[in-house]
């Protein structure tokens, strides 16, 4: 298990702020069981696995955004259904 450095991660992310945001969201996905790791876990904590994935170029905002996309319903969908039944 090699150490992960910030410099390794910054090769795949624009700046440190984006690195922190990306790593924290990915670590939360791994910790809650929402997603499977793309690298062997090797008895690491979720934050370390997230940083290793970023350094390897396996995770970017496209991977994170897939979980954040939520199917949207119209704001007044329930009201519209009730009014259609009344007609």
From Swiss-Prot:
<dbReference type="Pfam" id="PF01192">
    <property type="entry name" value="RNA_pol_Rpb6"/>
</dbReference>
<protein>
    <recommendedName>
        <fullName>DNA-directed RNA polymerase subunit omega</fullName>
        <ecNumber>2.7.7.6</ecNumber>
    </recommendedName>
</protein>
<dbReference type="GO" id="GO:0003677">
    <property type="term" value="F:DNA binding"/>
</dbReference>
<keyword id="KW-0804">Transcription</keyword>
<comment type="similarity">
    <text>Belongs to the RNA polymerase subunit omega family.</text>
</comment>
<keyword id="KW-0808">Transferase</keyword>
<dbReference type="GO" id="GO:0006351">
    <property type="term" value="P:DNA-templated transcription"/>
</dbReference>
<dbReference type="InterPro" id="IPR006110">
    <property type="entry name" value="Pol_omega/Rpo6/RPB6"/>
</dbReference>
<dbReference type="InterPro" id="IPR003716">
    <property type="entry name" value="DNA-dir_RNA_pol_omega"/>
</dbReference>
<dbReference type="GO" id="GO:0000428">
    <property type="term" value="C:DNA-directed RNA polymerase complex"/>
</dbReference>
<dbReference type="InterPro" id="IPR036161">
    <property type="entry name" value="RPB6/omega-like_sf"/>
</dbReference>
<keyword id="KW-0548">Nucleotidyltransferase</keyword>
<comment type="function">
    <text>Promotes RNA polymerase assembly. Latches the N- and C-terminal regions of the beta' subunit thereby facilitating its interaction with the beta and alpha subunits.</text>
</comment>
<dbReference type="GO" id="GO:0003899">
    <property type="term" value="F:DNA-directed RNA polymerase activity"/>
</dbReference>
<keyword id="KW-0240">DNA-directed RNA polymerase</keyword>
<comment type="subunit">
    <text>The RNAP catalytic core consists of 2 alpha, 1 beta, 1 beta' and 1 omega subunit. When a sigma factor is associated with the core the holoenzyme is formed, which can initiate transcription.</text>
</comment>
């Amino acid at each position: 298990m090699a150490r992960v450095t910030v410099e390794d991660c910054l090769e795949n992310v624009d700046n440190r702020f984006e690195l922190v945001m990306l790593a924290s969201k990915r670590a939360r996905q791994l910790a809650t069981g929402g997603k499977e790791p793309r690298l062997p876990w090797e008895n690491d904590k979720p934050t370390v696995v997230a940083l290793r994935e970023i350094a390897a170029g396996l995770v970017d905002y496209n991977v994170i955004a897939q979980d954040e996309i939520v199917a949207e319903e119209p704001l007044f969908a329930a009201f519209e259904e009730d009014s259609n039944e009344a007609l």
